[in-house]
Amino acid sequence: MSSSTFRTLAVAVTLLHLTRLALSTCPAACHCPLEAPKCAPGVGLVRDGCGCCKVCAKQLNEDCSKTQPCDHTKGLECNFGASSTALKGICRAQSEGRPCEYNSRIYQNGESFQPNCKHQCTCIDGAVGCIPLCPQELSLPNLGCPNPRLVKVSGQCCEEWVCDEDSIKDSLDDQDDLLGLDASEVELTRNNELIAIGKGSSLKRLPVFGTEPRVLFNPLHAHGQKCIVQTTSWSQCSKSCGTGISTRVTNDNPECRLVKETRICEVRPCGQPVYSSLKKGKKCSKTKKSPEPVRFTYAGCSSVKKYRPKYCGSCVDGRCCTPLQTRTVKMRFRCEDGEMFSKNVMMIQSCKCNYNCPHPNEASFRLYSLFNDIHKFRD
């Protein structure tokens, strides 16, 4: 090889290396699209490595780079191999993550899969978590929909709600007679798609609502129509220990439409001692406060502030301790990539111990499985 040819190749290699380094650096000013990109089900939005724009997080075994980061909430990291100058890598699971077993199949930590057409699942450190691909099946139909039922749609996986249109008028007339509504209240019922409460009617007719409904005048409604605000009580926490979810249904919104609200809840930490703190002669430890301020965690992100939450204790006589009074706090969370979001979190004020246990007594079964629970752990 002649010296001129060698110099030409050396210059070409140098220029290529400089070009790659230039592409790997972050821009001086961020230029992002006005609307955030729409990601596939189960794929979250994260900020790129430069902290500029929101992008769809790369999943297991997908190509990644500084501008296309992996989904850290699923324990994924961009693996560039042994090369220190590589610009692209492959999303791999962190080494400490455990695989999952689901339907006699093994999935790697961070791997996403679709067991059926209605769910998208992900293996996260030995536990399988799924999100529904048919959210309309989980939402509540309008109360103005008589005899609602889910029906299969030809060529589609998800079922849809249908109403008996022919019986709408008869159904509303029956409600009017039952509740003794006047003409204005009948119109209110139709417009709000809620069963209105007439004057002097008994709240026992609506046992699902724990508090007395209130009337809201909303200027956003046509002609200043009234909205009878109704909200159910919060459901029990989905977990007896560790982080769970509590839900309720309300129409307290500008549209006066029934929606489901959720909040994060933790009745007690899973590692909380059961009997060590009991005084002599005592059989229950009702309410315990965290000995020091802690940060709440959710989906790999931590609360911005520290809190000293109260937890429910345990009993040795077969009773169970559950929250008696709670309040809901809107909490700010920060992720490793700088992303921030808010979530409603349950804060326990007091607990009670009784024999009316919603699940086996925590004294002997501190961990329990929900109906149709898909979590399966491996050592």
Swiss-Prot record:
Its main location: secreted. Residues 25-94 form the IGFBP N-terminal domain. Keywords: Cell adhesion, Chemotaxis, Disulfide bond, Growth factor binding, Heparin-binding, Phosphoprotein, Secreted, Signal. The modification Phosphoserine is found at S184. Residues 226-271 form the TSP type-1 domain. Low in kidney, adrenal gland, testes, brain, and ovary, moderate in heart, uterus, and skeletal muscle, highest in lung. Residues 1-24 form the signal peptide. Induction: By growth factors. GO terms for biological process: apoptotic process; apoptotic process involved in heart morphogenesis; atrial septum morphogenesis; atrioventricular valve morphogenesis; cell adhesion; cell-cell adhesion; chemotaxis; chondroblast differentiation. Residues 284-358 form the CTCK domain. It is found in: Secreted. One of its GO terms (cellular component) is extracellular region. The keyword Disulfide bond applies. Belongs to the CCN family. Interaction with integrins is heparin- and cell-type-dependent and promotes cell adhesion. This is CCN family member 1. It comes from Mus musculus (Mouse).
